[in-house]
Design a protein with these regions (language model features):
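Non-cysteine beta-strand/loop elements that form the S-adenosyl-L-methionine
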Residues: 63-69, 108, 196-206
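Charged helix-capping and loop-helix junction motifs
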Residues: 47-51, 83-91, 119-130, 159, ...
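A short acidic, helix-capping loop that chelates divalent metal ions and anchors anionic groups
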Residues: 72-79, 112-119, 181-182, 207-213
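Short beta-strand segments at enzyme active-site cores
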Residues: 36, 64-68, 103-110, 143-145, ...
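N-terminal pre-domain/capping segments
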Residues: 1-93, 99, 254, 258-260
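Histidine-acidic metal/acid-base catalytic patches
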Residues: 1-4, 10, 16-30, 57, ...
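Active-site acidic/histidine proton-transfer and metal-coordination neighborhood
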Residues: 16-20, 57-58, 77-171
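Flexible loop residues that form catalytic
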Residues: 39, 71, 111, 205, ...
Length: 260
């Protein structure tokens, strides 16, 4: 893969007093770019994002990608009016803070149930995207809608929505593990999304459960995926996203994506 590879670290499991030392360790593996974690957004302390940015700078790291706040009350398909307003407000504040970090993509979950139909959520998705895109544009960050646990039909319609919206600050995040276990497979799902993929979440599984394994611990054809990634017209970078984010896992990703 010719584009930059960004490494995911599960920062929410790391004590505050260990964050900087872990950043230094990760940098010693050859990592230069890390995924900015949503746990760094604290509603009672907005300055914490700046603190983390300073840690990264001191460790010789940068962050070009961020996973949006996610889960109940944070996802795109939030139907309660007050909850939706609060959700949009949080994302806007986080995006404003991320502009100081240098983040370029912000991956956003739909939050739809697996069997949900696009027609039932389309208006809410559009409403949320409409609300966030001006903030994304102001901060030069692309909003990337992710294929999560939804059906292949919904992913096709979401992809058509993004294509029809045709906005430079709206794209898609292709999650290879989700494609492998929830949709029609990696190649097939990537082809559906290909024209507007701006970032990727890469991890492995055997096609039956969303394990978030490093390469080699599943049935993903990494050689094929590596080739496919270089054909994506809007791809800015790709992100590792395995639960095992240690040094061996990092080097496994580098090996299969020819980053060594």
């Amino acid at each position: 893969m010719k584009k930059n590879l960004i490494h995911f670290v599960e920062w929410k499991r790391i004590p505050e007093n260990k964050i900087f030392s872990v950043m230094e360790e990760v940098r010693s593996w050859g990592v230069k770019d890390i995924v900015f974690h949503p746990c760094f957004f604290k509603e009672d302390d907005y300055s914490y994002v700046r603190k983390i940015r300073e840690y990264m700078e001191d460790a010789g790291l940068k962050s070009s990608a961020c996973h949006a706040l996610w889960g109940k009350g944070n996802d795109c398909v939030t139907t309660d009016a007050d909850e939706w307003k609060n959700m949009i407000g949080k994302h806007k504040k986080f995006l404003d803070l991320l502009s100081e970090v240098g983040v370029k993509t912000y991956t956003y979950h739909l939050g739809a149930a697996h069997e949900e139909k696009w027609e039932n959520i389309a208006s809410t998705v559009r409403k949320s995207v409409d609300a966030l895109l001006p903030c994304c544009e102001r901060n030069n960050i692309i909003l990337a809608l992710e294929n999560s646990g939804e059906t292949p039909d919904l992913i096709r319609k979401m992809s058509n929505f993004v294509a029809g919206y045709s906005h430079p600050y709206l794209g898609m995040c292709f999650d290879s593990g989700h494609a492998n276990c929830y949709q029609d497979g990696i190649r097939e799902t990537l082809e559906v999304m290909r024209e507007n993929i701006v970032t990727c979440h890469l991890h492995d599984n055997n096609g039956t459960f969303d394990d978030h394994n490093p390469p080699g611990e599943g049935n993903t054809s990494w050689e094929e995926l590596d080739t496919l990634l270089d054909t994506l017209p809007r791809l800015l970078h790709a992100e590792t996203e395995s639960g095992d984010w240690g040094e061996e896992a990092w080097h496994s990703f580098c090996r299969v994506l020819k980053k060594n």
